[in-house]
């Protein structure tokens, strides 16, 4: 029986307020309006960004809200004017949209898109309203995705059709973590054969940076993390050395140590932690004259980065990167094909699985430090 044009009642994990566990609720999902797509979400990843906003530290966080931004599923229905996808298409949700019309999209210089940024940041769809209701209240959307609901409504520029044969419990992770790190290495940094790479933080994004660096022939890939259990993960993905700054001899400066063991510093470093002191260390351990440090991690609201200007005057570059510099609607299908062809690891990131009713366990797993990615089965 078709649900097109009707309100769908389904389960969702609702965050009623910051700092509290998610609540499994029956919500109403309204039909898509013009240039919107309603998606049956089959699998979603759980990301540190979801936990960050749930904690209350995110200045853009609004409650009550349906979190989740690593989602894959099938198009259930489309609104007027939607041409990019059709009912039944396998899709990945995109928290970084691609309209192909705005100043950003047309610049050829960035993967950012400005078309729906203002409303997305407020937790609303492009017309300034919500498609979620629960207990008589509207719920906010999250990052233009809201994949913690069995059905969601997104802008048509925030979803991409992908290959039907690609397993959705894997493609969901290409919606954020895996793509973010891998793209930062191959797209933003454009690592070359023989480069020396420093990766600060060995979670999902850091491990993704490693596999990007390996694919480009980096000669040294040194991972810096204060959790010794991450060494085995770093090794599995291709790191050549693991450094735990907390176990170095007393009085050892981590920047001086890294410069010493790399004969002058790294060609590229990547901050995958969101810690502003680590960001500084990542920059200052770059090679004088040409080293580049790419910031991927999201810092807490109000935090600022600092270094001596001389670090930049002498040739180091500080650069930022969102979603791996990937244009989602244009480039995601080829990334999925690379996964299908065995060129990108995705399965290896999945350490935990839960059903929607147990989604809070995924957040507890993440904070325990032994979880790379948890995947939630939505139905």
Curated annotation (Swiss-Prot):
The keyword NAD applies. Zn(2+) 2 binds at residues 99, 102, 105, 113. This is S-(hydroxymethyl)glutathione dehydrogenase. The gene is FLD1. GO terms for biological process: formaldehyde catabolic process. Its EC number is 1.1.1.284, 1.1.1.1, 1.1.1.-. Zn(2+) 1 binds at residues 47, 69-70, 176. Keywords: Metal-binding, NAD, Oxidoreductase, Zinc. It is an enzyme of class 1 (oxidoreductase). It comes from the Eukaryota.
């Amino acid at each position: 029986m078709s649900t097109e044009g009707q309100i769908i009642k389904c389960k969702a994990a609702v965050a009623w307020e910051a700092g509290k566990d998610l609540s499994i609720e029956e919500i109403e999902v309204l039909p898509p309006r013009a240039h919107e797509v309603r998606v049956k979400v089959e699998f979603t990843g759980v990301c540190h960004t979801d936990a960050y906003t749930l904690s209350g530290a995110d200045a853009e966080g609004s409650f009550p809200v349906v979190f989740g931004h690593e989602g894959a599923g099938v198009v259930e229905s489309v609104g007027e004017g939607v041409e990019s996808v059709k009912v039944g298409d396998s899709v990945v949700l995109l928290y970084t949209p691609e309209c192909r019309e705005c100043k950003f999209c047309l610049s050829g210089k960035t993967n950012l898109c400005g078309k729906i940024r203002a409303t997305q940041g407020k937790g609303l769809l492009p017309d300034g309203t919500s498609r979620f209701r629960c207990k008589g209240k509207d719920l906010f959307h999250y990052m233009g995705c809201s994949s913690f609901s069995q059905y969601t409504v997104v802008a048509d520029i925030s979803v991409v059709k992908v290959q039907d044969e690609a397993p959705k419990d894997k493609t969901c992770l290409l919606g954020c973590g895996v793509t973010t790190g891998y793209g930062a290495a191959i797209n933003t940094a454009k690592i070359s054969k023989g480069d020396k790479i420093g990766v600060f933080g060995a979670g999902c994004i850091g491990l993704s940076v490693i596999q990007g660096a390996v694919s480009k022939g980096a000669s040294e890939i040194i991972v810096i993390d204060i959790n010794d259990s991450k060494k085995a993960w770093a090794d599995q993905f291709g790191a050549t050395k693991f450094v735990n700054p907390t176990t170095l001899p007393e009085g050892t400066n981590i920047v001086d140590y890294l410069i010493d063991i790399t004969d002058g510093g790294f060609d590229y470093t990547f901050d995958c932690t969101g810690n502003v002191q680590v960001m500084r260390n990542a920059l200052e351990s770059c090679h004088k004259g040409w080293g580049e440090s790419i910031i991927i991690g999201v810092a807490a609201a109000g935090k600022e980065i600092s270094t001596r200007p001389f670090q930049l005057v002498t040739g180091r570059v500080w650069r930022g990167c969102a979603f791996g510099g990937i244009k989602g609607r244009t480039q995601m299908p080829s990334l999925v094909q690379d996964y299908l062809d065995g060129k990108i690891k995705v399965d290896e990131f999945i350490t935990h699985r839960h059903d929607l009713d147990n989604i809070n366990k995924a957040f507890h797993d993440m904070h325990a430090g032994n979880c790379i990615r948890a995947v939630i089965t939505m139905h």
